[in-house]
């Protein structure tokens, strides 16, 4: 007999699987460093079709396993944001975090696509469904923001304008599908080091600042890749290239292969290339792969939905 205090007394058995996308930054303007050490950001995120699958089951204790690309590089304990998400959600509802988490990774690790944040968002959604908590979306967003600046967008998906540290989101109208080639350079760029390098470059001579995001928003609303291409911009790009000069070769290779434009996404080391069509993206991806300027190349499209429960297969 249960004493009424165990998870088994109040949650159904079974498992829940959530798919969650990686992101690219189409536009990123960085304000000066604030007193709290953060920078004020204005960014436009787009969720793209590189998806992690996160499965959560009821268990006796909290555990985390990771398979897929780059799994061996990731911690499977409290250092992992997905583990922290499970503890936070359980604490929010006054329960023990007794779940097993399995992450099947397709979002490249240390690629600047917020894969760790995506997995954390997926855990929140999966536990909400598995435990039938009915935690409202606004509360999930609040929990997500406590975990990290990129976690709320992984919940949101689609295309969004982010402000503050990037966690304050407004939905952006984005017509049509945009086609991307994502090239992941060798080496890892730590976000804090890229910000520090940007601060140094600005003290030395102030690299150019982007105009406001209005024209980018208009191009997205029009669904016009040709209109969007010259407007892609990232004020962190100069710092990322300064720390990893090989990114310059990657950007050049993508444009020479036929991309409309290329940009370092976020703090890098991912380069995102906008292509005129799905077929063109495959061609650009093949050519960039052959040049040998990056470790991995992926073709993706966006926008796609944020973290969503995968419907269980129906029995016939």
UniProtKB/Swiss-Prot annotation:
SUPFAM superfamilies: GHMP Kinase, C-terminal domain, Ribosomal protein S5 domain 2-like
Catalytic machinery residues: 23, 150
GO molecular function: 4-(cytidine 5'-diphospho)-2-C-methyl-D-erythritol kinase activity; ATP binding
Any GO BP: isopentenyl diphosphate biosynthetic process, methylerythritol 4-phosphate pathway
Gene3D superfamilies for the chain: 3.30.230.10, GHMP kinase, C-terminal domain (3.30.70.890)
Top enzyme class: transferase
Listed name of the protein: 4-diphosphocytidyl-2-C-methyl-D-erythritol kinase
Organism whose genome encodes this protein: Mycolicibacterium paratuberculosis (strain ATCC BAA-968 / K-10) (Mycobacterium paratuberculosis)
Designated gene of the protein: ispE
